[in-house]
Amino acid sequence: MVRICIQTPILLSFLLVLLFFISNCFASSQNNDDDKRIRVRVGLVLDLGSVEGKIVRSSVSMALSDFYDNHNDYKTRLSLLVRDSHGEPLLALDSVVDLLQTEGVQAIIGGNSLLEAKLLAELGEKARVPVISLNSPMSLSLSKYTHLIQATHNSASEVKGITAFLHGFDWNSVALVLEDHDDWRESMHFMVDHFHENNVHVQSKVAFSVTSSEDSLMDRLRELKDLGTTVFVVHLSEVIATRLFPCAEKLGMMGEGFAWILTSRSMSSFHDQFIDDLTKEAMEGVVGFKSYIPMSKELHNFTLRWRKTLPVEEVTGSEITRLSISGVWAHDVAWSLASAAEVTRMPTVTSTLLEAIKESRFKGLSGNFQLDDMKLLSDKFEIVNMIGSGERRVGFWNSNGSFSNRRQLSSTHDNLETIIWPGGSAQSPKGRSLRESGRKKLRVLVTSSNRFPRLMKVETDPITHEITIVEGFCIEVFQASIAPFNYEVEYIRWLNGTNYTKLAYALHSQKDKYDAAVGDITITSDRSMYVDFTLPYTEMGLGIVAAKERSMWVFFQPLTPNLWITSAAFFVLTGIIVWLIERAENKEFQGSWPQQIGVVIWFGFSTLVYAHREKLQHNLSRFVVTVWVFAVLILVTSYTATLTSMMTVQQIRFNANEDYVGHLSGSLIANAALTNSSLRAMRLLGLNTSEDYAQALMNKSVSYIVSELPYLKILLGENPGHFLMVKTQSTTNGFGFMFQKGSELAPNVSREIAKLRTSERLNEMERRWFDKQLPYTTDDTSNPITLYRFRGLFMITGVSFAFALAVLLILWLRERWEILVNSVNIYFSQRLRHFRILFTRTIHPSPLGLDNPIGENAVQMAQRNRR
């Protein structure tokens, strides 16, 4: 017994030493394995002071831990380098620059806002490093970045779901409530366009910022209520939403008959710690769209383990209560990065980290992970109903464009469970349906000066003073633009003259009386302070019109003097060259010198009309004439076209009264333009109608008329052929319709005007009311043809003439070659003999008298005579 007791401590000591040795060996081997592993550095830039930042950080860390527990044999390890951006895009940018330069990170996770995503994407493009953005809004401005990966909501699918939801309840008129920030405005543009394409009328659109006061919220909501709006689509963050809904409840807008729909981006920004009991109570009955992540065993287990890893103070303080969709995306993104890092380290793989991420395929917590056009999109949405302090799921919006619910319980909406609306009613609000509530009356002020009836004509009953006729180009455009919105229009005559700035102020100050104004109203900056203008529906700018002046010498103007002289010289040169070629054999080119000169000139100029009667016998002369006739054809054709243009629109010449300029009486626009240095005049003459314009120009009371283009088009249309638009300047903004400040009709009508313009209907209206084609201007007149423009033509002709002369010279030399050779030989032999004699006498001088060959010959002759 004693022996056993003695041996037991020894045995235990031995076992402890053995275990210690084994553990050290295992640890050392593990450390050796860790040293052999390749570290891939990844930057994680988040707002660590926000709930989303904390969720994403913890989710990424836990995801990497799980990944390498499951893949312990991998040779790579992601090393997270976390930086706090404090919610500031510039701090995030600075952090990423530091990570790239000092740490050499190979990927970046960050960029939750639109601006932050753009900044980080720019760096990613230059450094060729993938940037993964979580929950940043979809935007066309981000599509150009090839190294940016987005995990976000599918905005297109969501907008289709909201539109189908509205149509299901027969709501075709809504108000949009959004946050005045780039992130929220950007994603709202697609929604507005989709609503318009699907006949959902956006009655009003209001924007709030985080700095908006409660009074501002109340005032804007009260305006919406006064408009009769009952259906609202809300797209803003929880910071504003928690203040908006209590204000709406105070105004009675969270009761029966109202409907509020929250977008998925708004719903994903809600966290329990920001929503107090008052806000939860006010939001009862609100319907929201949320990106749907199907619950799975893996997601459930991960969420439970994730909550256990959170600090105690965050769990007990209810700061973080659930894993957000950004946290789920962060988990899957971390797995794809870890998998891609391992793939790129394989010796047989040449893919970059970005390419490996794009090719990643696995089943993650959010479902099947697969990038589509550099995006990980959530295109299925669950529809929740805010009840009490929580949410109740009432159905799903599927990517195939249909609604469904798990219980298959029917409600007032197909395939959705029963919704409890604001006020506690299960009966769906009727909304502001124009088909049910009838046509809304639109009270429109119309200008009634009747100075240009083709633009605007208003007639009233002399007894009742009620408007009996409203017509004109402006009215037709307005009626075509407002027709899609099914308004009953009530026209009200404006009786205070042509001061349309006062008209704008009246529309602004008397909102209870007027909704819009129509007429020949120019868009100006001072008027836009009071009202909202539509797009211009007329041409923009001023024009100058003057009377045409006929010229008796217009036929000289198509060609410049240099071209006239050069053409005449080539006509004569053609005759000379043909005469040189034909005169030896052709009798028609022979005769006395006066006759031959006449033939040369006649033949050259007769080619102008192809009327030369002389028959050519030499092919060389035919070649010369063919080339020149081609040149003449081009000259004549160009001359005819230019002369036609000049006779259609002749240059004008102002009359002697250069100090008189006509303009529309009372037009502030024309008066302001005439003070410009380019249109300055000594004296102005105010005119009232198009008839006054025409009479003043015809009797030369004014030199020209300066007015806006629509007025001048009417003048030219009523007096075709008498006047000419000399010049135009884009110094005005054209005519537009005026609406109340903030009215949604202004952008909607602008969109209809754009459609009228692109469909050519607007041009048809102009032709019908102005009764003419587009006016000719001096800009339409062709410039005279210069010699420089035809230098190539004359170069070709000159080279052809030179070639013909060269051939003629060669033929002449060949015919007279023997005679020329003999003459040359005789000439050179005589010169050689004289040279030899001169050379001989220079070397051996002769006796006196003998050095003169003439003297020598004389002596010899004398001797012969003696014999």
Swiss-Prot record:
GO terms for biological process: calcium ion transport; calcium-mediated signaling; cellular response to amino acid stimulus. Keywords: Glycoprotein, Ion channel, Ion transport, Ligand-gated ion channel, Membrane, Receptor, Signal, Transmembrane, Transmembrane helix, Transport. SMART domains: PBPe. Residues 28-560, 644-792 are extracellular. The keyword rRNA processing does not apply. Its main location: membrane. It is a multi-pass membrane protein. The keyword Kinase does not apply. One of its GO terms (molecular function) is glutamate receptor activity. Belongs to the glutamate-gated ion channel (TC 1.A.10.1) family. May form heteromers. This is Glutamate receptor 1.2.
